[in-house]
Amino acid sequence: MIHTILPTPKKTECFEGVSILVPAIGTDHAAFEEYLPVFTGSAKRIFGLNVALAEGGIRVEYDAALPENAYRLDSREGLTLYASAKEGLLYALATALHAVKVKNGELFCEKALIEDWPEKSYRALMVDLVREWMPASRVYKYIDVCFLQKLNHLHLHFVDDQRFTLPSKAFPLLPTPEEHYTEEDIRGFCAYAKERGITLIPELEIPGHARHLNRCYPEVFANELPEGVDATIVTEEGLTISAKNIVCAGKQSAMDGIRAILQEICALFPDSPYIHLGGEEAAIKAWNYCTHCQAYMKAHGIEDEYDLYSEFIGRVTDMVFELGRTPIVWEGFPKKGSHRINRNTVVIAWESHYQLVTDLLEAGFRIINASWQPLYIVDGFELRWGPKEILEWNVYNWQHWWEHSAATLNPIHVSPTEQVLGAQICAWQTTFEQNINFVMENCTALSERLWTVKRLWNLEQYHKRHHESVRRIARLIQDR
């Protein structure tokens, strides 16, 4: 329904009455035809209605005057959607799925005129597929959530200490038995996401969170430590990180192995412009004792493990650039080492601890906001945030609950800038069943705050729209 559409369209003019619609959708613009089944398939799941691919019902028309990311919806006489490119078309189809209603088997839409486009270009959900294994069928549901709520990126955390959930021919022992995605699965994810305008972002977590790599191929990736040396570290938040969790930054075999895995990831995800490399929570103390790392540091004039950390991030991000993709890393490297990393690298600022967003912006990096508070969903964590807190936040704010974060007592705010590309919800260490309700609700609120950066509604006004919007997502992703 028009008044419950989220994210809120830029311009909406409502008129009295409704337009009764023939349950069909068609276009005479050949480039748009392949995307119309996205609407018909979604309408079947949301409304239980068969919408034909035919003329005489909803019209989809090409309008060269519209920017690629914009669309118009006109339901004054029937329902016509206008766009100039795939991006705007898919936003129009998602809006139409929110705008139409079915009653007594009849399809109709309130009479209105909508003009709409997004403000922030990066609107994302991240899902942890490692700590809790999820079958392939669940991944499709996250893609559906992104499509209907106009989030245009889905960041998939495939690799961590517990599992390696990607296929690999270069290192066949890496894929966790019975708990990894096949090449066919990945092709399915890519095709489904592409049809819906969702960019998939695969992640290879290095140099930390790499216990699985070291366990399967120690001769390739592991540090070589003297017998009896314990390089385990305990973080300020009490997290114990073993030296077994970090790859060696000194031996060539580790770098060759990382390159081989990255090449496989690029082949698996041909349409993904980004590759995420992790880059935080690493037990770099181990590098002080590793014979290969010490030799590398001496040969390259690297002063300490922190400098090596930044230099390593610089090397692996350069690999990604050489492969024709753009690297993304977590905010994990120190300010002192920023000069070692290509400024075209995108940094996700989340903790406000390793390096502050103000310093990252000053250094010239582009930023994604993943402020732990209110954008994290973590199982077993006593603090949890929902639409209320996300509405109160904005894309230029960083907050945290943790006493060691610089954003705890005094949230960090930066001036509006195009360097801040957008933001993402992060769902960690949860099963699908544990996180999906939070994902649906929080992604809806995040999309509202990124589609238009200026806040439009108070909590009561927002909730009048929120319930129906989330209900339609739930119907779209429910098992049949």
Predicted ranges, named:
Residues 2-8, 66-276, 290, 315, ...:
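Feature activates predominantly on carbohydrate-active enzymes
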Residues 1-115, 321, 326-334, 341, ...:
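Acidic, contiguous N-terminal accessory segments
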Residues 236-238, 243-345, 350-359:
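Active-site neighborhood of glycoside hydrolase catalytic domains
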